[in-house]
């Protein structure tokens, strides 16, 4: 009978810390994107710059920012199962999950930072196109990191109790 290897507390905490970075990046996008690109009237009157066209610009229903973020979430929904499938079939010496996480970590952070940078100072469709590109890259790299990360949970330990403990620390 083989012995069940117990997952160390250190490994559990390392796994939990792995969520901190992507949680911060996702929180930045979800909390600040609208505030940064869709300024309210008081903020505009205070002199804060505007970078993308404002108002209901898409079929009189959506703002440019609303359309970009909606498309980003649809793109994310499409890439999630694709990345999951690629990760499941990965035959790397580093395992099935880690290569994706390594490849995505730095571009994920950079795409988040560049989402809040505008190539043109002032209102421009170039800024809207750049925002679209950066947000799609953000969601792609988030998927490349988070999907394999979450797939590590069953691989953390060999018992249900160990998996529960690992998930609870996250």
Language-model-detected regions and their locations in the chain:
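Membrane-embedded alpha-helical bundles of multi-pass transporters/translocases
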Residues: 2-167
